[in-house]
Amino acid sequence: MTKKLIKLLLVVAWMALIFVFSHDTGEVSTKKSDGIIINTMEFLLERDLTDAEKEKWISYLVVPVRKGAHIITYFILGYLMISLLKEFRLIDKRTFIFAIILCILYSISDEVHQYFVPGRSGEVVDVAIDTIGSCLGIWNWGYKWKMRERRKELNLLRQRRKKQVKNNE
């Protein structure tokens, strides 16, 4: 399999996973979020929580957990997307912008999809949060790519200097 095909399959698979999570009804989605909060707090506190404590922790953490999930999910999508686009062209500003646009369009389609799922809603603020996550993922990939390129350049310079020193001896 070529690199392009593997990266394309990763992007499509990640988008499918986002779609599956978005297709959960409001009740199922709430149970998953609440379960993550309760299990995490019981693990951290090293004890079982009372029902009152569970409700308290859920009320404190449900928004950060759910919005954090958006950021992480779209961070990964952005990272995968720019990695895929790199296979089709040289990296320049247009490639980064195109990756961001594709992630935003997918986020919008995801929120429209959620609008039609029972107990869910499509939220503009979630598109904004998804966009932040995508931009962070794309930036992270770009930063790593730039560091790899700099390392390659430094290695070439070192090799040239070694040759010059060797030739001068």
Task: Spell out what each predicted region is.
Residues 13-18, 96-114:
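Small-polar-interrupted transmembrane alpha-helices in polytopic inner-membrane proteins
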Residues 1-75:
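"…centered on the first transmembrane helix and the immediately adjacent amphipathic helix/loop
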Residues 71-87, 132-148:
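Membrane-interfacial alpha-helical segments at the cytosolic side of multi-pass membrane proteins
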Residues 149-169:
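Membrane-interfacial, low-structure loops and terminal tails that flank and connect transmembrane helices
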Residues 107-131:
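Interfacial helix-loop-helix junctions of multi-pass membrane proteins
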Residues 24-28, 84-88, 92, 116-120, ...:
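Membrane-interface elements of multi-pass transporters and channels
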Residues 3-6, 88-98, 120-124:
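Membrane-helix interface segments
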